[in-house]
Curated annotation (Swiss-Prot):
<keyword id="KW-0675">Receptor</keyword>
<feature type="topological domain" description="Cytoplasmic">
    <location>
        <begin position="55"/>
        <end position="63"/>
    </location>
</feature>
<feature type="topological domain" description="Cytoplasmic">
    <location>
        <begin position="295"/>
        <end position="363"/>
    </location>
</feature>
<keyword id="KW-0597">Phosphoprotein</keyword>
<dbReference type="GO" id="GO:0070165">
    <property type="term" value="P:positive regulation of adiponectin secretion"/>
</dbReference>
<feature type="transmembrane region" description="Helical; Name=3">
    <location>
        <begin position="103"/>
        <end position="123"/>
    </location>
</feature>
<feature type="transmembrane region" description="Helical; Name=4">
    <location>
        <begin position="143"/>
        <end position="163"/>
    </location>
</feature>
<feature type="topological domain" description="Extracellular">
    <location>
        <begin position="251"/>
        <end position="273"/>
    </location>
</feature>
<feature type="topological domain" description="Extracellular">
    <location>
        <begin position="85"/>
        <end position="102"/>
    </location>
</feature>
<keyword id="KW-0807">Transducer</keyword>
<feature type="transmembrane region" description="Helical; Name=6">
    <location>
        <begin position="230"/>
        <end position="250"/>
    </location>
</feature>
<dbReference type="InterPro" id="IPR000276">
    <property type="entry name" value="GPCR_Rhodpsn"/>
</dbReference>
<feature type="topological domain" description="Extracellular">
    <location>
        <begin position="1"/>
        <end position="33"/>
    </location>
</feature>
<keyword id="KW-0472">Membrane</keyword>
<feature type="topological domain" description="Cytoplasmic">
    <location>
        <begin position="214"/>
        <end position="229"/>
    </location>
</feature>
<feature type="transmembrane region" description="Helical; Name=1">
    <location>
        <begin position="34"/>
        <end position="54"/>
    </location>
</feature>
<keyword id="KW-1015">Disulfide bond</keyword>
Length: 363
């Protein structure tokens, strides 16, 4: 290996031989992509949390899981500006050791948390549709909150190792802040990156397939609302695959190259390393798109926007504010006045499932 390769690509990390690249293409492409994901993700998840915190007066287990999904997505999204800066500077971290560890930990923890709670939402929907009288459909808010805390504890436990690793790593004249390096050794972080995709993928696909099959067995898929619900379920699964599968496939390719070629010639990894970080940016897109799940999974969100738009139009026409009722009361008032609200969410948690739980409200 010549001196140019040694200086630019080869790096020893924790006594392991690694290949590290600082590609100019990443500087040009990824910051704008992350910028868009940050803007739309911040708006969508920020608005979702605002509705959860200030415009919902009644909580159910399903909403508690959705709230935790929104928290995970929001915490991931707010880390993206620091990652953008890291890319713009060509992997030259300028904020020191502790901020680097925190950023890597937050990205990993909340990516994993987002996947876990998205999976929990799918499982919750599965039991309400396929097993409407199962005991899991009757869990209290307290139990749902305890389950959420346990899941957060597991997520933190699986990613806390990133807080223990000294960062950044000296790479020539630059400070490398990255949790993904091409090293010829097994890493727990790498294994979890693969496991956190394949296990939830299997669960989400199983739940989605069983829900669709159950509805068709009952011949409910003939109704227009149920058809839209089935389409929505399929879209959620497809978006999950599109966002996470590419980076997993590329990472598996890197593992294969490490097994067959080692790290003697780092040039072998230039293209796959670039492909990995491009596809890794797709995973953050999932957190940007998750607010769509909130919108279609609970009647409160479409009802909130409908109420907000109607009020704005009313104020514009009359020129007088309407202070008679608060938005939060309208969201949690008489279920009979809630247009097209999914009954499984609006009713008590112990009541049987209604097919309208699955999909968007009627136009």
């Amino acid at each position: 290996m010549n001196r140019h390769h040694l200086q630019d690509h080869f790096l020893e990390i924790d006594k392991k031989n690694c290949c590290v690249f600082r590609d100019d293409f990443i500087v040009k492409v990824l910051p704008p992509v992350l910028g868009l994901e940050f803007i739309f993700g911040l708006l969508g998840n920020g608005l979702a949390l605002w509705i959860f915190c200030f415009h919902l007066k009644s909580w159910k287990s399903s909403r508690i899981f959705l709230f935790n999904l929104a928290v995970a997505d929001f915490l991931l999204i707010i880390c993206l500006p620091f990652l953008m800066d890291n890319y713009v500077r060509r992997w030259d971290w300028k904020f020191g050791d502790i901020p680097c560890r925190l950023m890597l930990f937050m990205l990993a923890m909340n990516r994993q948390g987002s996947i876990i709670f998205l999976t929990v939402v799918a499982v919750d929907r599965y039991f309400r549709v396929v097993h409407p009288h199962h005991a899991l459909n009757k869990i209290s808010n307290r139990t749902a909150a305890i389950i959420s805390c346990l899941l957060w504890g597991i997520t933190i436990g699986l990613t806390v190792h990133l807080l223990k690793k000294k960062m950044p790593i000296q790479n020539g004249g630059a400070n490398l802040c990255s949790s993904f390096s091409i090293c010829h050794t097994f890493q727990w972080h790498e294994a979890m990156f693969l496991l956190e995709f394949f296990l939830p993928l299997g669960i989400i696909l199983f739940c989605s397939a069983r829900i669709i099959w159950s509805l068709r067995q009952r011949q409910m898929d003939r109704h227009a609302k149920i058809k839209r619900a089935i389409t929505f379920i399929m879209v959620v699964a497809i978006v999950f695959v599109i966002c996470f599968l590419p980076s997993v496939v590329v990472r598996i390719r890197i593992f294969w190259l490490l097994h067959t070629s080692g790290t003697q010639n780092c040039e072998v990894y230039r293209s796959v390393d670039l492909a990995f970080f491009i596809t890794l940016s797709f995973t953050y897109m999932n957190s940007m798109l998750d607010p769509v799940v909130y919108y279609f999974s609970s009647p409160s969100f479409p009802n909130f926007f409908s109420t907000l738009i109607n009020r704005c139009l009313q104020r514009k026409m009359t020129g007088e504010p309407d202070n008679n009722r608060s938005t939060s009361v309208e969201l949690t008032g008489d279920p009979n006045k809630t247009r097209g609200a999914p009954e499984a969410l609006m009713a008590n948690s112990g009541e049987p499932w209604s097919p309208s739980y699955l999909g968007p409200t009627s136009p």
